[in-house]
Amino acid sequence: LSLHDALPIWILDELYPQGFKHNEQSLRVVDVLENLNLTWETRDGIVNHSGTNMASTLEGQIVKFADRIAYVNHDIDDAKRAGLISDNELPESCVNVLGTTSQSRINTMVSDIIYSSKDKNIISMSESVYKAMWDLRQFMFDHVYLASRAKNEEIKAGSIIKWLYYYFLENTLELPDEFKCMLLKSGNERVICDYIAGMTDRYATNKFKELFLPETLS
């Protein structure tokens, strides 16, 4: 799990002068950081797996739906474990269409995609299932992502990213070797974004403790 899944990666968009976009970073990872020789179709699927643009291939369109399905169900499970929501709070209209459990929701959406896309040259969902999925996503925004408790945690996480960003901006020689060697070609701020964006939430938290907290407090 890296920062685009866990910590508020949009903070980097505020910090980095050229802006930071998750899908563009995903493409940079395979093109630059990993130096992979991928096909145009694969790269198109990566850069269009999020956002409003549609991938050019059926495979890429499937990935985009799969990402949305996994995202909303994963976050519901996490929110329930954290005590932020309960099953009874999920919108009845969504439950009636998608089901009551994570397994049933995933099965409904995947089956609907298969049925709705059969014999077509585009991957799609039926209107009712698509609406239920987006209504569920909106519910998560209203009750989890923007809720006070989650927002407070996001503020804390954002502060960690800022501290790390500015620290390494002033101490580039402390970057791992695989990032230091990129400084001259890509520039300090770009490389620091690469480093932070690849961190897991646990790694970022531990790095913050290592750099800023006395050993007895970390």
Q: Can you name each region flagged by the protein language model?
A:
Residues L1, Y16, S50:
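Acidic, glycine-rich active-site loops and adjacent beta-strand->loop/helix elements
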Residues W10-Y16:
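Active-/binding-site microenvironments in catalytic and ligand-binding cores
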